[in-house]
Amino acid sequence: MIKVTIIGSGNVGFHLVNLFHNSTKIKLNEWCSRSIDFDERVKVINEIENLSESDIYVISVSDKSITEVSDKIQFKNKLVVHTSGSTPYNSLNNKNRRGVFYPLQTFSKSQELNYYEIPICIEAESDKDLEILKKLSTDVNCKHYEINFEERKTLHPVSYTHLTLPTTRHV
C-alpha cells in the first residue's frame, strides 16, 4: 500500500484528499495545511517541518510556491511530485526524486466530481518513479497519461480554457 502525504489545502489539495481517502489501495498518511486544523479522515499537520515519512509527497500549492515548499521537506530520496500543469518537475528540490501528478481538471471545493473520470498527467525523472505514479493513478481508478513538460505546457492553457467554459448555452 502506497503511503501518501498531501501538502496544500487549495482546490486541488482538497480534492486529492477526497480521492486518496476513498481508495482502499492508498494510505492517506497526512495532510499538511496552514489553514485546516482538523479533518476526521486524516491526520492534519500545520508545519511542513513536522511531516512524517511517506512514500510520496504531493505538493499542491500555487506554482510560485512549489520550489519553496519542496525545499522545506526534510527527507531525502523520497518521491516528491507537484500538481501543476505549467511547472517543470525540476522546480522541485533535487535532494528527492521528482515528478508530476497533474489532474487535468478545473477544481472548486464546492463542486462534486466524479474522480474516476479525471485524467491524470504524469511525468517522473526515472522510469522506476514513473511506474510508481502509474500505480498511484491506477490504485485510485484514474486513467493516466505520460506527458512531458513541453506537452503539458501546451495542454495546460487549452484544457484550462476548455474546462472552465460554461457547458450550457442560453439563446
Mark where each language-model region is:
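Short loop/helix-cap segments at secondary-structure boundaries that form the rim of catalytic
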Residues: 36-41, 51-52, 72-75, 89-95, ...
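Conserved small/polar residues in nucleotide/adenosyl-binding loops
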Residues: 161-170
